[in-house]
């Protein structure tokens, strides 16, 4: 009889404290930084790209909604395990066993949701926690593993960083579920939906920041302070503080010999430019 090799019963990608931390690459994101993150991913190191994609989902509610719709379309489907040969008793027995194992997982829908993270990021990985009972190898649990724990080496082999091997090891056979989603052809590091929309996300980020700044001052006159020639640094500082105070409290005091002038902003300019750009992105 052919000997069947048992899977690894040990936990390989043990959760580590640094897994929950991020370098928050979206903070101060620029075209140069985004290009640098993508170059790292193209070379096999997807850590910063995975962190960026995670932030993009958190910060853009429309983007999150679109990805969630795709995921829910899958998790909402019914499923069944069909035997390879419906006339073969052994095949039917195997199918029934597999289905019972899936049903025994506390929340198989969460397992699917974790693996569907590949839609945005191009790849998602979960580790199978194997057990042995009554002479059978069983699935005790399926645990999501963060994408930043994985990378491609110089030979383009997929590896996982572990506590004992931070330099990475090849994935043990029958130990990990790797979902590679292809929004487009090419390497998995470049195949996720978020890779395609990242540039628009960056430009939208710039636009929203400028739009918020614009909204803060739109319709408000420019507050121009004038100080007398020979005014001291203390007088200049007091005048500036008064200008700021007027902006928030609509009242203020200034030293004698100084003046505040209000200049109305030009309202003839187009005010929907920011909204049009945000909608495009």
Say what each PLM segment does:
Residues 227-231, 254-280:
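Extended, non-catalytic structural segments that build the interaction scaffolds
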Residues 2-64, 68-74, 81-257:
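Structured, contiguous alpha/beta core segments that scaffold functional sites
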Residues 239, 280-281:
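Generic structural signal for hydrophobic residues
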């Amino acid at each position: 009889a052919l000997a069947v090799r048992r899977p690894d019963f040990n936990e390989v990608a043990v959760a580590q404290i640094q897994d929950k931390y991020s370098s928050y690459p979206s903070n101060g994101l620029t075209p140069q930084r985004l290009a640098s993150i993508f170059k790292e991913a193209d070379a096999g190191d997807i850590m910063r790209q995975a962190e960026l994609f995670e932030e993009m989902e958190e910060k853009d509610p429309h983007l999150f909604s679109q990805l969630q719709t795709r995921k829910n379309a899958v998790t909402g489907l019914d499923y069944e395990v069909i035997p390879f040969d419906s006339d073969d008793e052994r095949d039917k027995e195997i199918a029934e066993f597999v289905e019972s194992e899936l049903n025994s997982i506390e929340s198989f829908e969460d397992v699917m949701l974790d693996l569907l993270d590949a839609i945005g990021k191009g790849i998602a990985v979960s580790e199978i926690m194997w057990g042995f009972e009554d002479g059978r190898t069983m699935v005790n649990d399926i645990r999501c593993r963060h994408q930043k724990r994985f990378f491609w080496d110089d030979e383009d082999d997929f590896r996982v960083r572990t506590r004992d091997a931070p330099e990475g090891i090849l994935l043990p056979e029958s130990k990990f579920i790797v979902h590679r989603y292809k929004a487009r052809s090419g390497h998995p590091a470049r195949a996720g939906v978020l890779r395609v929309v990242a540039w628009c996300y960056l430009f939208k980020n710039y636009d929203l920041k400028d739009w918020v700044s614009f909204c803060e001052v739109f319709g408000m006159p420019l507050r121009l302070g004038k100080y007398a020639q020979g005014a001291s640094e203390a007088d200049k500082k007091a005048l500036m503080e008064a200008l700021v105070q007027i902006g928030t409290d609509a009242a203020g005091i200034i030293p004698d010999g100084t003046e505040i002038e209000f200049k109305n902003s030009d309202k003839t300019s187009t005010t929907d430019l920011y909204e049009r750009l945000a909608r495009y992105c």
